[in-house]
Amino acid sequence: MTRRVHVIKDPEVAKLLADETRRQILNKLRHDEHSTTDLAKALNRNHSSIVHHLNQLLDAGLIEVTREEKVRNMVQPYYRSVSSSFHVAYSLTEALSQDPDYSAWQEEYIDNMLLALNGYGISVPEERRGEAKTLLQTCYLGQKKAYEERITKRISVPEVSKYAARNTANVLSHIQLMKDKEYMDALHRLSEIIEEPEEDQQG
């Protein structure tokens, strides 16, 4: 049985997640075991490329071999991730900001958060998009830190539904975040941007 959350504390391991193909492989292996051939077909990648990425993930301890099967006189291993969820430690934030690939990935993530606001009918004015991105990043990192602290303090997994457990965890995170002045300041400033009357946004 895989662990529910795997906290990555090694910056070199965290950098592996900056590659989209490796993220896609991990996502596949979180749900079920797959062979190299399975992954190559599913991701439309050549076999040697998948082998390369699998070896990196295997060496990093993010995946494991679950079984081996003999196919045409060859041994074909099957892989699965060691966890259903991966979390890059908040303590690595500063170190990883110096890595161009990881920084680009995180930049894209924040861009997507900004874009996701459109789904709620929220359009951030062009002149305030830079500010909104900075505030979103502060909120994201604050939530990331609170989540990490929360899961490290959990001493057992209660026998309740996953939805009840998740909502309880969210309440605890909100209580913790209320004590984070930087997070709360960013949240209030962000709310001022996204709650501006439409006529004000249009100038």
Where on the chain are the PLM-derived regions?
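Short capping segments at the starts of secondary-structure elements
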Residues: 31-35
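A short acidic, leucine-rich amphipathic alpha-helix
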Residues: 38-44, 57
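Glycine-centered, phosphate/nucleic-acid-interacting loop/turn motifs that mediate DNA/RNA or nucleotide
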Residues: 61
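Short beta-strand "wing" residues that participate in macromolecule-binding interfaces
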Residues: 65
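Charged, low-complexity intrinsically disordered regulatory/assembly segments
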Residues: 115-203
